[in-house]
């Protein structure tokens, strides 16, 4: 199951992104879970719950702790999380490279950009997975999570 987080200080965009993702996953028949957060501070406070998100949609321009600062802290704990910046301002696009964001989406293009973005992310994630057969059954693992096989 894909774990997805949306972090935006505007409720309208949190709901819009969630609706677009729900529509996307309905057509792909994939299992997913979406959590929404109104700020970087609230998002990071949930880190104590040990939730590791596969994909995070992050607004850049937020009060107090902005999206770049929040993403930097996410990267410190989860280097393989797929970060997508969603913003109304093109000015910060280059900042996304500092935290290895996979996409930088303008809010006025969400309807067309989200499906393309998700296709690219899922393709990238599938390339990083390997299926193994164990005594207890089969399992698909991310190659980045494999430390040792005996």
Language-model region placement:
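Short, well-ordered amphipathic alpha-helices
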Residues: 14-24, 43-44, 71
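CheY-like receiver
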Residues: 45, 50-127
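Conserved SAM-binding loop
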Residues: 6, 36, 85-86
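Switch/coupling loops of ABC transporter nucleotide-binding domains
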Residues: 2, 32, 81
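Conserved binding/recognition cores within well-folded domains
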Residues: 115-150
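Short hydrophobic/Thr-rich beta-strand motif most characteristic of the beta2 strand and flanking loop
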Residues: 26-39, 46
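Conserved acidic segment of CheY-like receiver
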Residues: 2-21, 56
């Amino acid at each position: 199951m894909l774990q997805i987080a949306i972090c935006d200080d505007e409720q309208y965009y949190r709901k819009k992104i969630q609706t677009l993702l729900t529509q996307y996953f309905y057509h792909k028949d994939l299992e997913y879970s979406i959590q929404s957060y109104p700020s970087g501070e609230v998002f990071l406070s949930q880190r104590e719950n040990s939730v590791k998100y596969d994909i995070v949609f992050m607004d850049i321009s937020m009060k107090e702790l902005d999206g770049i600062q929040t993403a930097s802290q996410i990267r410190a704990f989860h280097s393989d999380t797929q970060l997508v910046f969603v913003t109304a301002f093109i000015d910060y696009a280059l900042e996304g490279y500092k935290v290895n964001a996979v996409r930088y989406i303008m809010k006025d293009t969400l309807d067309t950009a989200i499906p393309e973005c998700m296709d690219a992310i899922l393709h990238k994630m599938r390339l990083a997975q390997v299926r193994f057969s164990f005594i207890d059954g089969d399992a698909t693992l991310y190659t980045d999570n494999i430390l040792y096989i005996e």
